[in-house]
Regions:
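DNA-recognition alpha helix
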Residues: 31-60
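Short Lys/Arg-enriched helix C-cap and helix-to-coil transition segments
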Residues: 81-98
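Positively charged, polyanion-binding regions of nucleic-acid-associated proteins
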Residues: 2-34, 38, 42
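Short Lys/Arg-rich cationic patches that frequently serve as NLS/NoLS or arginine-rich RNA/DNA-binding motifs
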Residues: 2-5, 70-74, 89
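Short intrinsically disordered terminal tails
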Residues: 1-5, 99-102
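Short, flexible helical or helix-coil boundary motifs
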Residues: 25-26, 43-47, 76, 80-83, ...
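Major-groove recognition helix of helix-turn-helix-like DNA-binding domains
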Residues: 52-81
Length: 102
């Protein structure tokens, strides 16, 4: 029970940080790398952190994974049109074409 509550709290915090990044950094709306760096900065991470240190902190659950941040971006952009970047409509149109070809 306690672990579930901790995970829910962590997810809520990640979601808020992704939302903050999307509202304050227009480039983050179309570029997941920019978004992830912005979120990591909110956790107090340096931009010249070693990759091994980053991976260790992600595996320990101290930092969110890149996939988690991307999922939150997709969710937030789906439910809030103001957070969508210039590429959002292009991605949706392409996804529609791919679905039809399958």
């Amino acid at each position: 029970m306690k672990t579930t509550m901790n995970n829910e709290m962590k997810n809520m915090i990640v979601g808020k940080r992704v939302y903050y990044a999307l509202t304050n950094n227009v480039k983050a709306r179309d570029d997941d790398s920019v978004l992830y760096i912005d979120v990591l900065k909110q956790y107090g991470c340096s931009t010249n952190m070693r990759a091994t240190t980053l991976e260790k902190r992600v595996s320990e659950g101290v930092l969110p994974s890149r996939d988690t941040v991307t999922r939150y971006r997709r969710y937030l952009q789906r439910v809030d049109e103001t957070l969508r970047g210039t590429l959002w409509n292009k991605r949706q149109a392409y996804a529609s074409v791919v679905r039809k070809s399958i």
